[in-house]
Regions:
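A polyanion-binding, active-site-adjacent surface
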Residues: 2-214, 218-227, 260-265
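Active-site-adjacent alpha-helix immediately C-terminal to a catalytic or transition-state-stabilizing loop
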Residues: 221-240
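Short, flexible loop segments at boundaries between secondary-structure elements
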Residues: 234-273
Length: 294
């Protein structure tokens, strides 16, 4: 599939980007940064097909862009002054922007252009990790950075493109992607909003109305079903190494899988189990089969 011409990205007819920005801003106390996030959606919608990471059209007034030579995902930096000094959550003593590598991923949604989707798939990842960006700004991207032409075409994790493409093409779906924990600060998801993250997800479910919810990793299961996955992570790995954990969340069919990161060692067990049932396929084919055949 040619994603540049065949994919519709963040169509407001599927979900209102303004509604998502309002939801995040209200619950995460983003204050004056709300306008920058709304503008970021407009840039992503218009520049998705063919804008390079160093295209000057990505720049927004009062904000910055991380060096595109090392950040192909076109990270938008919203600095402290945009939030305003009267925003203690972000700018006060102990405010979030005093932490390093603060990040948020704006939810995005995609489908084949001019398609008639047969299923609405919500994909929930863990958290918006960042690295090497210092303090004083909120760095904005999207889950797996599919908004960036270069990142999606040269990703270090092409597996996710294969999986999402299968959801759009083979399952004829519209796919909404988000993180369960919305804010990341160096080393961990920012915990100041722990009680809020699930309520934000509940609102996203209302806005998107998914047919199925797909979760990746133990963090997602811990948020949806606190205490179920157990610790250490080995308990979760055993729970999902043959097939995803299945449940209902808010009345929606929910499947939680092992995290698809190439760094996840438990995927060796996943691949072995699938290959045992499907002799002759490769390890990567087995892993993709695990994530896409449900």
């Amino acid at each position: 599939m040619n994603w540049e011409t065949a994919v519709s990205f963040c169509d407001d007819g599927i979900v209102s980007s303004d509604a998502i920005v309002g939801l995040l801003s209200d619950n995460l106390r983003l204050g004056n940064a709300q306008a920058a996030l709304a503008e970021r959606y407009r840039r992503m919608q218009s520049l998705y097909p063919n804008a390079s990471a160093d295209d000057p059209r990505w720049w927004q007034d009062g904000c910055t862009i991380a060096d595109p030579r090392s950040h192909w995902d076109v990270l938008l930096g919203i600095p402290r002054n945009v939030f305003g000094a009267d925003n203690p959550t972000w700018c006060g003593t102990g405010g979030i922007l005093n932490c390093e590598d603060v990040g948020i991923d704006l939810p995005t949604w995609m489908m084949r252009r001019n398609a008639n989707p047969q299923i609405r798939i919500m994909v929930v990842a863990e958290e918006p990790k960042r690295q090497g960006l210092g303090t004083g700004a909120l760095w904005v991207s999207s889950p797996w950075a599919f908004h960036s032409m270069e990142y999606r075409n040269h990703s270090r994790n092409p597996r996710m493109r294969t999986i999402i493409e299968a959801f759009m093409q083979d399952k004829e779906g519209v796919v909404y992607m988000t993180d369960i924990r919305k804010i990341y600060a160096k080393g961990t998801a920012h915990r100041g909003f722990d009680g809020t993250y699930r309520s934000i997800l509940d609102c996203e479910i209302e806005l998107f109305n998914p047919s199925v919810l797909i979760g990746y990793g133990s963090t997602v299961l811990d948020e949806l079903r606190p205490g179920l996955s157990g610790h250490p992570d080995g308990a979760f790995a055993r729970l999902v190494c043959h097939r995803p954990y299945e449940d209902l969340y808010n009345g929606v069919r929910t499947l939680v899988f092992a995290h698809p990161s190439p760094l996840n060692a438990s995927l060796g067990c996943v691949a072995s189990n699938v290959i045992n049932e499907n002799p002759g396929i490769t390890r990567e084919e087995a892993i993709v089969k695990y994530y896409t055949e449900w």
